[in-house]
Swiss-Prot record:
This is Queuine tRNA-ribosyltransferase. Homodimer. Within each dimer, one monomer is responsible for RNA recognition and catalysis, while the other monomer binds to the replacement base PreQ1. It is an enzyme of class 2 (transferase). PANTHER family: QUEUINE TRNA-RIBOSYLTRANSFERASE (PTHR46499:SF1). One of its GO terms (molecular function) is metal ion binding. InterPro entries: ArchSynthase1/Queuine_TRR (IPR050076), TGT (IPR004803), TGT-like_sf (IPR036511), tRNA_ribo_trans-like (IPR002616).
């Protein structure tokens, strides 16, 4: 992997990631394809929108369909019909999400499979081997996602466990030509974030992620930890904010120096009839849209906005039609892609602060 930092504008960064399956322009948003598919979309549709990279999930693909199926296809790219870069998360967050169904030890995590109840054991070494089989362009270390809330002692113990697991992940990744990212943890405590970042930088990863945010903490805490942590990460390596977020979150994080994002929000919200637009959200299920013959957003050129009305999409979502979920997902992903394209153009033009002011003013208009 090679990362070129092309230019900066304040804290915002414009770059390129050179990966095994292609070049990715940053800042970049990666749609989430948990089971090897972005829900309701085909790979061709995702590529046609303009996305250059997807995120897929190590934990879920390991459980279903299983590694032997993916290995028989020669890796995840051929299995899912996507020939551009893929980042896979390590499974740490999914194990964290199992709650009482899992037991964390120094060696790894014991848990009952949520699909069939089988007793399973996931370690840093296992996670690296799974991701090697998937042949993901960017591999994430196996870490423990620090819960929220956590005392300083709990956050410290969790973070230091993640550091030990990071070292084991790095050792197990040896020989894999694909990139490996470290993940900064430490809860809501600046000193712990400092320790985590310092130790991970000493291990020399290809890129660095900020984890353990957007896990239920107040927005002010997320903003504080992000603003504190991002500038400490190496300027010549990509910076990835995991699991974030709303359009305003993305714009704020770019200003803080983040290069990569992923989130289920555009696809999950779409299936619930929540649409992102330049003037804020539209909850298309609401009765106010029943007779509205305008497109979702007059300034959007996605397929849904070029061909259908708000009233029609309202009808589809209320009726539970599959086309409704497809159109809303297509629109939301198109919005996110266009937002990041505008962010990159603003940094290129050295007008990012003007873009931010215009973005917030337009979002505040509402419908």
């Amino acid at each position: 992997m090679k990362f070129d930092l092309l230019r900066t504008d304040g804290g915002a960064r414009r770059g390129q990631l050179h990966l095994a399956h292609g070049v990715v322009q940053t800042p970049v948003f990666m749609p989430v394809g948990t089971y090897g598919t972005v829900k309701a979309m085909s790979p061709t549709e995702i590529a046609d929108i303009g996305f250059e990279m997807l995120l897929s999930n190590t934990f879920h693909l390991w459980l279903r369909p299983g590694l032997e199926v993916i290995e028989a296809h020669g890796g995840l790219h051929r299995f899912m019909g996507w020939d551009k870069p893929i980042l896979t998360d390590s499974g740490g967050f999914q194990v964290f999400s199992l709650g009482k169904l899992r037991k964390i030890t120094e060696e790894g995590v014991k848990f009952a499979s949520p699909t069939n109840g089988d007793k399973l054991f996931l370690t840093p070494e296992t996670s690296m081997q799974i991701q090697r089989t998937l042949n993901s362009d960017i591999v994430m270390i196996f870490d423990e996602c620090t819960p929220y809330p956590a005392t300083e002692r709990q956050a410290a113990d969790s973070m230091r466990m993640s550091l030990r697991w990071a070292a084991r992940s790095k050792a197990a990744h040896a020989g894999n030509p694909n990139a490996l990212y470290g993940i900064v943890q430490g809860g809501m405590y600046e000193a712990l974030r400092d320790e985590s970042a310092r130790e991970l930088i000493g291990m020399d990863f290809d890129g660095y992620a900020i984890g353990g945010l957007s896990v239920g903490e107040p927005k002010d805490d997320m903003t504080r930890i992000l603003a504190h942590t991002a500038p400490q990460l190496p300027a010549d390596k990509p910076r990835y904010l995991m699991g974030v977020g709303t359009p305003s979150d993305l714009v704020a994080a770019v200003a803080a120096g983040i290069d990569q994002f992923d989130c289920v929000l555009p696809t999950r919200n779409a299936r619930h009839g929540i649409l992102f637009t330049r003037r804020g959200e539209i909850r298309i299920r609401n009765a106010r849209w029943k007779l509205d013959t305008a497109p979702i957003d007059e300034e959007c050129d996605c397929y849904a906005c070029r061909h259908f009305t708000r009233a029609y999409v309202h009808h589809l979502i209320r009726a539970g039609e599959i086309l409704g979920a497809r159109l809303t997902t297509l629109h939301n992903l198109h919005y996110y892609h266009r937002l990041m394209a505008e962010v990159r153009a603003a940094i290129d033009a050295q007008r990012f602060s003007e873009f931010v002011a215009r973005f917030h003013a337009t979002q505040a208009l509402g419908w």
